[in-house]
Amino acid sequence: MNLQDHFLIAMPHLEDENFQRSVVYICENNEQGSMGLVLTQATDLSIAELCAKMNFMMADEREYSDKLVLLGGPVNLEHGFILHKKTAQEFQHSYKVTDQIYLTTSADIINTFGTAQSPEKYLVTLGCARWEPNQLENEIANNDWLVVPADENILFDVNSSERWFAANQLLGIEHVNFSYQQQMEHS
């Protein structure tokens, strides 16, 4: 099963602080391993503040997003990753995840923020998550993750603090079911 364009939903027993109660969007999954972005851990830095820190043109006529930058995972924390809807403009370092979703790592996309050339929908992360070949598949087999096809609404429109619950609901799972299960396991 190719996991690209799928959500990984952390099971409640997953205690790694990088992935606890997380949803990860898988951008790439092949024989060389997997790469994804954690969608549930907001930083205290807004996208507008990130643009200012990076000395991009902060023109008055632009409207910058007040959305928060996400902590995309424990790897490459010094690198930004922008997941976005397809645009008419091509960017220097973009990877096609699906026909409509791209991952861009070049700064030229940031210069479009607040303009008509900006992607209609996007999110910004610092860092990413990576797995060695077969590592992710083994974690799934060990019941660390649930897997569901990605949902663009959850990806771009749901608040990061609500994505874990929303992704679980794609599978018909309510968070109260997990709470009951955990209580039974600890009794």
From Swiss-Prot:
Gene Ontology CC entries for this record: cytosol
Signal peptide (residue range): none
Top-level taxonomic group: Bacteria
Short name of one Pfam family: DUF179
InterPro entries: AlgH-like
HAMAP family named among the record's database cross-references: UPF0301
Homology family: Belongs to the UPF0301 (AlgH) family.
The protein's name: UPF0301 protein HSM_1900
Organism per entry: Histophilus somni (strain 2336)
